[in-house]
Amino acid sequence: SICDYYKREYGVGYKPTDIVVTMGASEALTMTFTTIIDPGDEILIAEPFYSNYQTFALVRGGNIRPIPTSSKEGYRYAAKDKLEAALTDKTKAIVCINPGNPTGLALTTEEMDVIADFVIENDLWLIADEAYREYVYDGMKPRSFANIDRLKENLIVIDSVSKRFSACGARIGFVASKNEEFMTGIIKLAQSRLCVSTLEQIGSTELFKLPSSYYEEMKEEYCKRRDAAYEEIMKIPDVICHKPGGAFYMMV
């Protein structure tokens, strides 16, 4: 059902062998970092970021190298000069949470292409955390890094049932990549813990069959909440708050 979802919504042709179901996106991330990180490797990620990324990297001998951002610039980081300034000879990958947690930054098509070029030019892994992908506002259209064909061998997509379908207790996520060598490593790790809950997988299978109207209804509701919260927050003297373009977070 995950393959059908990607084909239906994004025109991406994943095969079942390109996907491993995990116990939430967190396990997908820990497996990914275990597979690609060697001691001393650095992972680029725009700051502020979901704090557990720091733990995921450190316990595997890697280090997070933050890309500084500013609220005044809307937390935007996908510019060639900013990316290259963070690059070192130890850089192994860049993580892109799109839309962002906790900034709500939604990357434009042009920004995604800049990141793709940077990844390919420097032979890096791109770890695309797309758990909030459908929830972009103000006329933006959802897009996956998987839509960028030239990233085929460099791209690792992390996804989650809990955010997209409000099913946090289900603990169902997955990792997707067309890089066969990477997926071989993921399969070995997955075999070490047998399997994810069968019952929860059955339920999640049906969630991925929901029509596009589901996302539109959820997006409309989240957008209303965002606008209402932003309007009240901006009444506070001297407050700094950038209206998020996606997800359901707001930095104040």
Model-derived features with residue positions:
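Conserved glycine-rich beta-strand-loop-beta hairpin in the small C-terminal domain of fold type I
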Residues: T205, Y222-Y230, I240-V252
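Active-site PLP attachment segment
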Residues: N147-G185
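A structural motif shared across PLP-dependent enzymes of the aminotransferase-like
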Residues: S1-D4, P99, C195-V196
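Conserved PLP-anchoring active-site segment centered on the Schiff-base-forming lysine
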Residues: T35-A57
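Structural signature of PLP-dependent enzymes
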Residues: T184-A190, F208-Y230
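Active-site phosphate-binding strand-loop segment of PLP-dependent enzymes
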Residues: S70-M140
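Structural motif of enzymes handling amino- and sulfur-group chemistry
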Residues: V196-S212, E217-M218, F248
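N-terminal small-domain helix-loop-helix segment of the aminotransferase-like
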Residues: S1-G24, M31, K82, L207-L210
